[in-house]
UniProtKB/Swiss-Prot annotation:
Gene Ontology, cellular component aspect: cytoplasm
Principal subcellular localization: cytoplasm
Presence of the UniProt keyword Protease in the record: no
Compositional bias per record (Basic residues), positions renumbered to this chain: 447-460
UniProt-recorded name of the protein: Topoisomerase I damage affected protein 11
Compartments, as annotated in UniProt: Cytoplasm
Keyword terms, alphabetized: Coiled coil, Cytoplasm
Protein family (similarity comment): Belongs to the TDA11 family.
Gene designation per UniProt: TDA11
Coiled coil region boundaries: 210-266
Length: 489
């Protein structure tokens, strides 16, 4: 397949009168640009091993005839200008010895294409340093790109160097001597072009790396600034929250101070009330010891009146000092004191607790007080029972005398009872004496029972019935009753 392709290329070259296999140097093609910059021919530096197949197809591209003619015309002293016949014979001999060598040589020489690159002073400076490296790299790459296409034939053997050509042809030596500086200059341009392209690529890569680094640096600086701004905002917010907390704490402390002042004012008013209450208690206790039967009720009422008057005085004097919190506290204290006083009066807790050594003396006093209280209660009970018995006796007497008693006397008795009940209700303590004058009918009834004197003694000591009997048997009966009325509350 390769042989057929090479033969086809050779045939087309012969028909088009194009020679692509014997070019050692390239003509200086002057590009027509507006800018006065200088250009040089550069050999392409191919280092990619994976693009071998592509390069194989690109090798067989034809060079335009007009471009080739221009290059040949400009290069008047071409080394192969006078030795076309020799080159033809050499090519024929090589093709006869190895049919595939012709295609390989053509393929190798067709890779050399003119490239125009602008020259700068920097590239001229770096030219001597990169000559050796580029030359060695180009030769190695050319030999290693297509190892299967050599087939044991050395390309250097097939291509003649200028020295060997000069030895075979004396005319060529003279022409070569005149063209040596130009060829040397062209080869230097071709070698340094690849290094220049590499330097350009490296400079572009370095510049790209620097740009990326600078961009990342700018991004990091922006991130740091943003973090710093956030920290400042948080610090300001924290400071504001601390100020708000401090203000609230101060307000709370002020409220606590106000409440404590109000409580202290109400507490300072309480001892006066307690002192007055203790003095009232002592007075009530002494009065209860002196007058065990009647006076305790009066003293308790007097104490309550005194307490209420003191409370009113305290309220009147402390209206300006009291606040909205002290008023309910004062009310609770008053109610508590009143309840406590009532309980102490009912349970005999007037005296404070005493040590153990004085318990016997206090117990004797308590016994005397308790005896007096119990005697007072028993007197009340007996008085009430005596009134009931008296009423029963009156009812029996009235039932016996109602037969002969006129209606007017019965009405008078009822009126007397009503008046007596009204008097009992009006007075707290009252001794009631009732005189009953019996009519003639009652006298006759009692005369029938003459000769018999009766003194009725009730169980109670506060009710006595006195009956007077005359010696003659003709006497009137006067019943005087002394009754102690119940307490009206």
């Amino acid at each position: 397949m390769d042989q057929k392709f090479d033969e086809f290329i050779a045939q087309t070259e012969s028909e088009a009168e194009i020679d692509t296999s014997s070019r050692y140097t390239t003509g200086s093609i002057s590009p027509q640009f507006a800018s006065p910059t200088k250009f040089k021919n550069v050999l392409p530096h191919e280092t990619d091993t994976q693009t071998g197949q592509r390069n194989r197809v690109a090798e067989h591209q034809h060079v335009p005839k007009s471009l080739l003619n221009a290059s040949v015309e400009e290069s008047h002293n071409h080394p192969l200008k006078e030795d076309k016949s020799e080159s033809r014979q050499r090519q024929v001999s090589v093709s006869n010895s190895n049919p595939s060598s012709k295609g390989m040589v053509n393929k190798r020489r067709s890779l050399i294409q003119p490239m125009m690159v602008p020259t700068t002073p920097e590239t001229d400076r770096t030219r001597p340093q990169s000559q050796s490296n580029v030359a060695s790299g180009n030769s190695a790459n050319k030999n290693n790109l297509h190892p299967d296409t050599n087939h044991g034939i050395d390309i250097n053997a097939t291509t003649q160097t200028p020295s060997s050509m000069s030895m075979g042809n004396p005319k060529f030596s003279e022409n070569f001597a005149s063209l040596a500086p130009s060829s040397k200059r062209n080869s230097m341009h071709s070698r340094t072009s690849s290094s220049q392209s590499m330097a350009i690529d490296s400079s572009l890569g370095g510049s790209m790396d620097v740009n990326a680094l600078l961009q990342s640096l700018a991004n990091k600086e922006l991130e740091l600034l943003e973090c710093k701004r956030k920290i400042d905002d948080l610090k300001k917010q924290l400071h504001m929250e601390e100020n708000i907390y401090q203000n609230k704490a101060n307000e709370l402390q002020e409220l606590k101070n106000k409440v404590s002042k109000n409580i202290n004012v109400s507490g300072s008013n309480q001892p006066v009330f307690n002192k007055t209450s203790t003095t009232g208690r002592k007075n009530s206790r002494e009065s209860s010891r002196r007058n065990t039967h009647v006076t305790p009720v009066k003293t308790t009422r007097n104490d309550i009146r005194q307490d209420t008057s003191l409370n009113q005085d305290m309220e009147n004097t402390d209206d300006n000092k009291q606040s909205m919190w002290s008023k309910p506290l004062a009310l609770f204290n008053q109610v508590d004191q009143i309840i406590q006083q009532e309980l102490e009066r009912t349970l005999n807790w007037d005296e404070p607790p005493t040590p153990v050594e004085e318990t016997e003396e206090n117990q004797e006093g308590d016994k005397s007080v308790s005896k007096s209280l119990w005697s007072f209660v028993s007197d009340l009970k007996t008085g009430l029972l005596g009134i009931e018995e008296e009423e029963d006796g009156h009812h029996t007497q009235q039932s016996n005398s109602n037969v002969n008693r006129p209606k007017n006397t019965h009405g008078q008795v009822m009126d007397n009872r009503k008046h007596a009940n009204e008097d009992i209700n009006l007075s707290i303590k009252e001794f009631k004496t009732t005189k009953k004058h019996l009519d003639d009918n009652s006298d006759t009834h009692l005369k029938q029972r003459s000769g018999r004197t009766a003194v009725r003694k009730t169980k109670s000591g506060n009710k006595l019935n006195f009956v007077d009997d005359s010696d003659d048997g003709d006497s009137t009966l006067e019943a005087d009753m002394v009754e102690m009325g119940s307490f009206s509350r």
